[in-house]
Amino acid sequence: MYGAKVVTTRVSRILEGWPGVVLVALDGLDRPGLVYPEVVGAVRAGDLVAVNTTAADLGLGTGGYHLVAARLGELESGGEPAPPPGHLIKWRYTPSQVACLTVEETEHPGARAVREFGGLEGIPVVAAELHSQVPAVAAGLRAAWAGPGAPDSGGPGRDSATRERRLIYIMTDAGALAARFSRLIGAMKEAALIDAVITVGQAFGGDVEAVTLHSGLAAARAYLGADAAIVAMGPGEAGTGTRLGFSGLSQGEALNAAWSLGGRPVAAARISWADPRGRHRGVSHHTLTMMEVSALAPSTLVLPELPAPLAAEVLAALAGLPERHRVAVADGRPALDWLAHKGIRPSTMGRGIEDDRPFFLAAGAAGAYAAGLCAAGLTSAT
């Protein structure tokens, strides 16, 4: 069974927004409407629009916005629209399908590098389940690359050791499909936590588009010169409360892809004692299930340094971890210091670092561990 609720209304006024997104007030609706101008076109007060209210009406979805699906009525004349930039379609066979110039197409400046890609050459690839983990993973890498005391000696991002390292975020299509929906991406780029974003599969809106996760990883290394990569979905995981019915299983698929292409797969653990749901307390059942049934490639699951009772609880939960995997422990605290210095405040289910510190420590620890792999003689592709 399927169902979508679409209503027609008018834009009453333009509200705030962020790059690639415009928020609008809508007549008769109590939530803002979210507009992707790259998909819908520009909107103005008074425009008649079709609005998809399905997720917001159900109380679902990160952000709580209605989505403006189309501008209706007579459009302004302005000659023929510009031709699409490429030939690959994302959001395929939906009314919102868009054409992209992907890195695999011959017209793309990265096409040759991807065609000649010979492997990831041992770079670490950190796979995270949730979008909210990405800033701490990135900060863990940057803090470790910069060395001890970097936030107090000129500030993160100014140290040559971290400026020379390239970190690429690969956003999959397991969550939000539009990279523009994420405010964290813009904040991470502005703070020099990440150098570029590649959107793969049906996801779109990154600095580079790729058809598959594998070609996205190839582009990260061969075209963008990644010293490390982070793979995670965009905002908004799909979950059902069942063992296999959650889109975070894609984390294991990312570990498999990294291993198959010659990278070093590193898994960020999902750990929390603030989540009210029992299945996510301690080590989340998502992490346990993913490492068992989805991550078939030998991978390293990284844990943060924790007080002894909590560490013992985590290790007990991991007693049944398949033998193909290994567990490592790293310090996630420098990552959180780095985020604080840069003014980046990620949250998970409304909980910030001060509310759910182990969750973010675990993500930072994965980044710190991955940076150690870079230190073991890895060099940039560029």
Language-model segments: which ranges?
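N-terminal amphipathic/hydrophobic targeting modules at extreme N-termini
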Residues: 154-157
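Flexible, glycine-rich phosphate/dinucleotide-binding loops
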Residues: 58, 176, 274
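Extended, charged alpha/beta regions that create polyanion-binding interfaces
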Residues: 2-122, 145-146, 161-168
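Residue-level signal for short, function-critical loop segments
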Residues: 55, 173-174, 271
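Long, contiguous hydrophobic alpha-helical segments, chiefly transmembrane helices and signal peptides
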Residues: 36, 46-51, 55-56, 60, ...
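Non-transmembrane, aqueous-exposed alpha-helical and coiled segments at domain scale
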Residues: 2-27, 144-145, 164, 168-169, ...
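A short N-terminal beta->alpha junction/helix N-cap motif
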Residues: 33-40, 125, 172-176, 351-354
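Phosphate-binding glycine-rich loops and their immediate beta-loop-alpha structural context
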Residues: 99-149, 159-210
